[in-house]
């Protein structure tokens, strides 16, 4: 049975590795990790050069081995912050470039590996080394033992070594270049200037010392034991490398510094069944990047991790050859891998011990837990059975109730269908009546509009009649005023006639008195006539002058005086007769004038009475017509209200009884 083990990942850097670069956290060591490159950054293009027996993979974007443009299978590792007091910096982001997928890469294998390794992303899970108890609320990322290892894809080809030693080289073909071109500078011959030749070992040594270790490979086919040493007689990297950049870690060796003591130099993945040195190959990208950014002297990782101050660097020696540099780099990587393998062995032993303890504790707890689970399951089964029986009983009752409800609903449905059929028949029967009613409503609406128009006309006529009535009232007031004036004049005439009657009576009395007096005078005149006739005798006319008068006696004189008195009486009677005739004429004239005035007053009175009667008759006719119009208007309003109530379906109100009141005035 395979055991999954994990390496302890410190949250803070170790004291002895304070100045060393922090490598990404190492994941769980199992056979599920493939040898594909991590998404630290795209790999530079492959440069064709002298083939080597092995290849390197770039982790942070500088070097890549095996497959060039595979999709990443693990999340990108963020760059670590530089520790204060050191001059090491990462330049991984500067050299991260996009590279097109290689035709030799297998995308299907990458997808399968990504699907299998989806649960291994992120930091490694934490195991609880406490015996007897495990966390119950474990997250999805739980370590589980596995007895099988997936078949990992094999690298399609072995790339050349110069393709891992620098960024993308520019040239005519884009894939060929020397080692100096891979380091970023132009290609130069052995006769180049001494300054540029002196800077190359510094850059290479700084690059080799500053880069973190890469990922481990997935097979033992490319082990470090098969790597050639590339040792030549004329190359001495120990003497040519500067002391500040290539410190020696062994007797007589000055290749490259190894990993910092006490802390892992980078993420490593190993299988629980494999511990050979053929598991890992180095990545030179991050280690070479540390020397590209710094041009001055800087402390080595070993000296900075141990707390020692590096001496000032000596003047740069002449540049070594490419084979010597490659030899130094490979020896340094070999030492790094040996230290990593030792650390992996230690962590594997610790993880195996912890996992064995946890497994034994869980084996001891499993019977008790199984018994408790069995009892709990039996109790739950009994409760579930009782609950199910209760639910079955309730469901049976609900079923019977639903059957009763269904039968009742069927009956109601039949009743509703019958009512619906009756409603449809009524609707079909009421259709023609509805049309007739609509036509009647249209006709009545036309009549109503006509009646409204007539009502408006009658209202206008009523207003006109009202104005005429006002004018008639004004005329009536004027006629009454004239009548009062006429009555006053009539009263004055009556008083004048009365006075005239009184005067006439007085005149008639005086006339009667005059008549009586005239009768008396006539009688007296008759007597006097008779006396005068008796006394009148024809006298003897004298022949001469009237000597008789002279000689008459006194008696003759008396007779002659009496005859003179009779003549005066006659004259007075005639005068009185003339006055009587005149008085008679005046009385007749006054009687005629009084009679004419009486006739005129009577005619005026009859005219006023006739005018008042006509005015009263007109007023009564106007009043009756107004009452008739009001009754018609009220009847129309009642009909409209009755129609509205009939449309609304309400009962008609009782008709109101209108009493006509006629008031007549007496003249």
From Swiss-Prot:
Region annotation (Sufficient for interaction with KATNB1 and for inhibition of katanin-mediated microtubule severing) maps to 448-667
Q: Where is the composition biased (Low complexity)?
A: 1-25, 187-198, 241-282
Q: Where is the composition biased (Basic and acidic residues)?
A: 516-526
Which residues, renumbered to this chain, carry the PTM Phosphoserine?
A: 248, 295, 568
Identify the stretch annotated as signal peptide in this record: none
Q: Which top-level group of life is the source organism from?
A: Eukaryota
- The UniProt regions of compositional bias labelled Pro residues, in chain numbering, are 310-321
What Pfam families does the record point to? Fez1 (PF06818)
Q: Which InterPro entries match?
A: LZTS, LZTS2
Subunit comment: Interacts with KATNB1. Also interacts with CTNNB1, gamma-tubulin and KIF23.
Family indicated by similarity: Belongs to the LZTS2 family.
Q: Which PANTHER family match?
A: ZIPPER PUTATIVE TUMOR SUPPRESSOR 2 HOMOLOG-LIKE PROTEIN-RELATED, ZIPPER PUTATIVE TUMOR SUPPRESSOR 2-RELATED
- List the protein's name: Leucine zipper putative tumor suppressor 2
Q: Give the source species.
A: Bos taurus (Bovine)
Point out the gene that encodes the protein.
LZTS2
